[in-house]
């Protein structure tokens, strides 16, 4: 159970970070392939970075809360 909790926390965090980076790459590719080139990707990237910072802080909060819940269950069992 201890290993599973650690593994699920790690995989959840990895999946969210990886998904954000993949969407960033797709946005850059979409923006630079258009008529405006790199200028067309600038505004969507700024918006996506702000959204990514919000999601990152939310993920950190969820990670900390889940870790506290897992630890509380362990302390409660003894």
UniProtKB/Swiss-Prot annotation:
It is found in: Cell membrane. The chain crosses the membrane at residues 13-33, 35-55, 57-77. It holds the Pfam family ATP-synt_A. Its main location: membrane. PANTHER family: ATP SYNTHASE SUBUNIT A, CHLOROPLASTIC (PTHR42823:SF3). Key component of the proton channel; it plays a direct role in the translocation of protons across the membrane. F-type ATPases have 2 components, CF(1) - the catalytic core - and CF(0) - the membrane proton channel. CF(1) has five subunits: alpha(3), beta(3), gamma(1), delta(1), epsilon(1). CF(0) has three main subunits: a(1), b(2) and c(9-12). The alpha and beta chains form an alternating ring which encloses part of the gamma chain. CF(1) is attached to CF(0) by a central stalk formed by the gamma and epsilon chains, while a peripheral stalk is formed by the delta and b chains. This is ATP synthase subunit a.
């Amino acid at each position: 159970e201890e290993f599973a909790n650690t593994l699920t926390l790690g995989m959840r965090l990895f999946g969210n970070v990886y998904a954000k980076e993949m969407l960033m790459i797709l946005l850059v590719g979409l923006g630079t392939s258009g008529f405006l080139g790199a200028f067309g990707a600038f505004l969507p990237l700024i918006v996506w970075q702000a959204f990514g910072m919000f999601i990152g802080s939310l993920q950190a909060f969820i990670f900390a809360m889940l870790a506290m819940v897992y630890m509380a269950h362990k302390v409660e069992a003894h």
